[in-house]
Amino acid sequence: DSIPLMAILFKPFHSILPEDFQYIGIYLLLCQLLQTWMAWLLLGAMSIHKPGARLAGTLILGLAPVWFFRWVHPALCSHYVLIGALWIYMGSRKTESLSPWIWRQLLILWISAYTHPYLGGMTLALTFAWLLRLWLVDKRWQAWQSLVGFPIAASIILLNWWVIGYFGVSSEGMGTVGLGEYTLNILSFFDSLNSYSTFVPSLPHMPKQYEGFAYLGLGGILLLLMTLVLRFRAKEKGVLHGLWPLWAFCGLMAVYAMSTDIYVGEFRLLKYSWADFIEEKAQVFRATGRFVWPLYYLVL
């Protein structure tokens, strides 16, 4: 896939660049730097200020296995927009003025539209979660403000997709190959696919479920278990208060990621059907397993 963001940036220099010039390496480095920076900001927004803890958390998020797994598909390495959207969700609750955060959210939306359609769709969903939080949790916005925000956010994504030319591709050209196959396995958070862990073996999965790769890493798994124990013992709401809109949207995306055949390893736990109009629209995002990424970073 192309990376419209980089193509537009380098277009003015086309006449002076060599014929074999490519920006893949530049963009991968940029993604790594931005992902690390967004992770640092996110942890600060979560009141993690001790340098050692914040640095460790930044490294875990910045060097996430799910990001390295996408190196063969550079346009999909733009996970910094997802972590950036999480930062806005967490950080905006601490400030009196929402104006700077609104502009940041608009910027994240705009950038995501120029990276990859999958990431644009995920970022839009995270924006919807933020708008719900402002209305239903923080009570900082009235209902009409958030309800107006939904179409505005969607328009930013759709308008920029139209500018790029995504709507010039017919659905016939997209086909249905992979729909219901490139999915998320329930065990994906613990499945290293053999290549991403020295200690954790690959778990059973269906042949094409690599698109739902979501391995947390051994450190991430241990931290998740420790966090669950500590949260069970804790009585205060703390920083997790007000996360239900985020969990709801990330959970819905994870359900979509599993598609209509839900597997635990190689065992099919559940099979159901989508309505025809949903299946028709889902052809655009037929590698549904990728939609686990927002939940992945939320869990991590």
Regions found by a protein language model. Give the residues of each.
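Hydrophobic/aromatic-rich transmembrane helices and adjacent perimembrane loops
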Residues: 218, 270-300
